[in-house]
């Protein structure tokens, strides 16, 4: 069973350049610019896994989160300013995450690559602390701390553990 996948759609630079507002191209080498968010009026954030392509909206499963929390919006705006100012993905996500209050709950917005390794370990620790059930949905899982913790949790058989991954990434 040979599968043929079309190349991903490409943005036409002249289309982006014709937009009536300033844009900044971020080089995707050596690090991929993978951010996907809108900060609206300093009050709301729309974010998730969705690439802003027709295929992403119509053919792919994605998750989208909308939060109306000015403190969270401020953190995303801070990350945007990092990207806008430096124009370099590798220099993004190094700001220390701030704990913010969202309706009486503490929250932090984490950005990568700056905090990527730390986040991998934090996610692994959170998985390891599960008491009842874990559900994992990721196109691919290659992070050592996460894989190791999943293997340990599975071996202990103490929680209901299930995961979905992109099968094309497994072949």
Annotated model-derived regions:
Residues 1-171:
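Charged, low-complexity intrinsically disordered terminal segments
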């Amino acid at each position: 069973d040979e599968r043929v996948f079309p190349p991903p759609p490409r943005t036409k630079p002249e289309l982006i350049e014709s937009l009536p507002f300033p844009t900044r191209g971020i080089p995707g080498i050596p690090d991929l610019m993978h951010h996907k968010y809108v900060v609206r009026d300093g009050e709301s954030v729309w974010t998730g896994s969705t690439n802003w392509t027709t295929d992403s909206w119509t053919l792919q499963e994605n998750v989208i989160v909308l939060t109306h929390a000015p403190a969270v919006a401020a953190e995303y705006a801070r990350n945007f300013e990092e990207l806008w100012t430096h124009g370099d993905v590798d220099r993004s996500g190094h700001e220390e995450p701030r704990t913010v209050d969202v309706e009486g709950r503490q929250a932090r917005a984490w950005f990568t690559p700056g905090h990527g390794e730390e986040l991998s370990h934090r996610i692994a620790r959170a998985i390891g602390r599960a008491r009842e059930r874990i559900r994992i949905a990721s196109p691919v899982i290659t992070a050592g701390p996460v894989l190791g913790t999943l293997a340990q949790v599975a071996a202990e058989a103490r929680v209901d553990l299930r995961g979905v991954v992109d099968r094309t990434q497994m072949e």
